[in-house]
């Protein structure tokens, strides 16, 4: 049966069906195109999101072992050397601390002795307010090497003490 054999109504019906089907296909394609456009509007962000970034890079085990051996050969001795220096400095500081505490104790004992001596003499002639008499300064000068005192400082101490005594005498005369 050919198309000529079919009645005219049926032919138009088939043609209508085809056009309807074609229209529906066009609608579906338009909707698909619209959905695709909406989806692809954000494509720049999506490409950025979906792109892979290399965060970690794999290196061969030989390179890793080589880096470890270089570290142990170069860095570890330097660290040990610095650690030894710090330990030596710590020991020096501890000895210095004990030396200074012993000196402080000795000075405190001397101060107490001078205060006792001052109370006995009741402000005697050779005793000043610092607790050092002429004899004490002479003893310091003779034992300066043993105690580590500076000679110039001791002479300056004697000079200043004498100057103070003269000034006190002058003030007493004026009053």
UniProtKB/Swiss-Prot annotation:
GO terms for cellular component: cytoplasm; DASH complex; spindle microtubule. GO terms for biological process: attachment of spindle microtubules to kinetochore; cell division; filamentous growth; mitotic sister chromatid biorientation; mitotic spindle organization; protein transport along microtubule to mitotic spindle pole body. Its main location: nucleus. It is found in: Nucleus; Cytoplasm, Cytoskeleton, Spindle; Chromosome, Centromere, Kinetochore. Keywords: Cell cycle, Cell division, Centromere, Chromosome, Chromosome partition, Coiled coil, Cytoplasm, Cytoskeleton, Kinetochore, Microtubule, Mitosis, Nucleus. Residues 70-122 form a coiled coil. Pfam families: DASH_Spc19. It comes from the Eukaryota. Disruption phenotype: Cell cycle arrest in mitosis either with unseparated DNA or with unequally segregated chromosomes. Abnormal spindle morphology. Inviable. Component of the DASH complex consisting of ASK1, DAD1, DAD2, DAD3, DAD4, DAM1, DUO1, HSK3, SPC19 and SPC34, with a stoichiometry of one copy of each subunit per complex. Multiple DASH complexes oligomerize to form a ring that encircles spindle microtubules and organizes the rod-like NDC80 complexes of the outer kinetochore. DASH complex oligomerization strengthens microtubule attachments. On cytoplasmic microtubules, DASH complexes appear to form patches instead of rings. Component of the DASH complex that connects microtubules with kinetochores and couples microtubule depolymerisation to chromosome movement; it is involved in retrieving kinetochores to the spindle poles before their re-orientation on the spindle in early mitosis and allows microtubule depolymerization to pull chromosomes apart and resist detachment during anaphase. Belongs to the DASH complex SPC19 family. This is DASH complex subunit SPC19. It comes from Candida albicans (strain SC5314 / ATCC MYA-2876) (Yeast). The lineage of its organism: Eukaryota, Fungi, Dikarya, Ascomycota, Saccharomycotina.
